[in-house]
Amino acid sequence: MPYALIFAAALHVLAAVFWAGSTFALARSGGAALERLFKPQLAAAVLAFATGGYLGHTLHAHAFGRGEQVLLAAIAASAAALVVQLAVVGRAVRALRDGAGDEAGPRALATAAHRVAAVLLALAAIGMATARYLPPAPVGTADAAAVSGSAGVQ
């Protein structure tokens, strides 16, 4: 395995573990370190998407079988988690930073958003961890034809 793939895989796992782990912690803690973790979470999410994009392009560019379909669903779940965190948690962080008076409202909103994002990130992790173990499509099905056609096999 080339060193670039090893490095990208390690960065991808580390960034995703930090992003998901801090999201799970914030979902359970009521947003105790919300303001301090928001930017590092976004940086980890961007790094996870960048390295995942490289890995996907390098390892799965010529196939769209069951494994790749599960990976696509996992990517969609993690993208939805990022959108929830950007939109809802970002708004709560701005409200807390601007001193909008009552801190309980923005913290409760951010906690709920982190709970939604945590579920989505858990689904993404399950999909990415299991995608490689799915059996290939049976020969003669439309799924198998799509995979062999995309790989250039006749």
For the regions a language model picked out, list residue spans one by one.
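Polytopic transmembrane helical bundles with strong interfacial aromatic enrichment
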Residues: 1-154
